[in-house]
Amino acid sequence: MGGRRGPNRTSYYRNPLCEPGSSGASGGGHSSSASVSSVRSRSRTTSGTGLSSPPLAAQTVVPLQHCKIPELPVQASILFELQLFFCQLIALFVHYINIYKTVWWYPPSHPPSHTSLNFHLIDFNLLMVTTIVLGRRFIGSIVKEASQRGKVSLFRSILLFLTRFTVLTATGWSLCRSLIHLFRTYSFLNLLFLCYPFGMYIPFLQLNYDLRKTNLFSHVASMGPREAVSGLARSRDYFLTLRETWKQHTRQLYGPEAMPTHACCLSPSLIRNEVEFLKMDFNWRMKEVLVSSMLSAYYVAFVPVWFVKNTHYYDKRWSCELFLLVSISTSVILMQHLLPASYCDLLHKAAAHLGCWQKVDPALCSNVLQHPWTEECMWPQGVLVKHSKNVYKALGHYNVAIPSDVSHFRFHFFFSNPLRILNILLLLEGAVIVYQLYSLMSSEKWHQTISLALILFSNYYAFFKLLRDRLVLGKAYSYSASPQRDLDHRFS
């Protein structure tokens, strides 16, 4: 009694949070302060392995107290799309200045030019198609706002119908007229280059659909009756994929309205299901950011250059630099809109419930008590479990993640710190602004000076909003850190 345990003495422990009914309990709101059973497992220790059994306090599941962040103003979707469209038009305008600039400051004795641009060299049909492609999100937001359902007055319904009809008719007529002119003027290769990004759009955003397995482009004449029926079914599956992809794309256009919610529960299976849904939602938002930014940079920087005559000189290095600036700036602006502060806080709450595991060398814990991992248990911090012939140590307050699942580890790594996304965006946007300021001070050409000065304004606004969200979230989490430490000390 009170002596040191021998190597053959049996250790007893209770399964962590596996009491009946514990897996189905759930809580609401922003906290999960329901009474949680503590786990006290005795374990053998050894001084030669370098790894000791965690203390009793480390094996007690501490209730999570989620931080309540203030409600930050969210920009309306139609205003955001107007702002993004305006920034893209500015970038397109400065690129046309780079391509079609003139020597208007020369005296009349030199080659005369009364305007700052060679307007007679600009193809306005190509400019119209490029403008419509860049403004597709803004046009879609107008149509969505004009298609709202509900009880509205007769005058308002007529006004919404006329707005929707006018926008769609004007856009469709302008696009068809410009495309017909381009078909008559340019070769098939040029038109293929113009429409190339849309050919990659659906395959990039498809919903777990493998085009290599469908053989959609096989010859119909070589198919028998059964193959024809199966090919028709595959084509229907393909069009279903297109429809679902377009629905997801249009849903992601309006980030704040489609914001998911957090279910603060104590069921391990429900927590993992919520994390899977949030992973899918986050991946969709990142795909939308990547595709939209690359599409904007493509039509701003590359399309005008491709249709320039071979005898026309322009600064190729500046065109490539503009492509990078537009792609990075558009990515940051879209991520700031699709990943607001409330969404970062939502991902952080889910990561706190999910927990994380660290793989441990079995040779260092051979004499330490190890529990077999079960999916219906909520494991406390510091406990050792066996899973897939490996040993893992629990790191979070709640640990319901699958130890061998790399996606769960990545989710907890990225979102365990609620400020990580905002910090990355701030560093990226700050680096772009510093580079633009350096280029602005060192530039000697008038068109580059105008271009950098105009593009800087959009980056200033995005940097201000990111800095505001970062400061507010940082203050909120710093205030909630001390009560959480007091709660941890009380449970220990």
Swiss-Prot record:
Residues carrying a glycan: 8
Residue spans crossing the bilayer: 77-97, 115-135, 153-175, 185-205, 288-308, 322-342, 421-441, 447-467
UniProt KW Acetylation keyword: no
Location within or outside the cell: Endoplasmic reticulum membrane
Primary subcellular site in the record, as a coarse category: endoplasmic reticulum
Pfam family, one: Tmp39
Annotated spans, Disordered: 1-53
Keywords on record: Endoplasmic reticulum, Glycoprotein, Membrane, Transmembrane, Transmembrane helix
Biased composition (Low complexity): 31-53
Claim: Metal-binding is one of the keywords in the record: no
Membrane topology: Multi-pass membrane protein
One annotated Gene Ontology cellular component of this protein: endoplasmic reticulum membrane
Top-level taxonomic group: Eukaryota
Family under the similarity heading: Belongs to the TMEM39 family.
Functional summary from the UniProt entry: May protect the cells against DNA damage caused by exposure to the cold-warming stress and facilitates tissue damage repair during the recovery phase.
Protein name (Swiss-Prot/TrEMBL): Transmembrane protein 39B
Organism whose genome encodes this protein: Rattus norvegicus
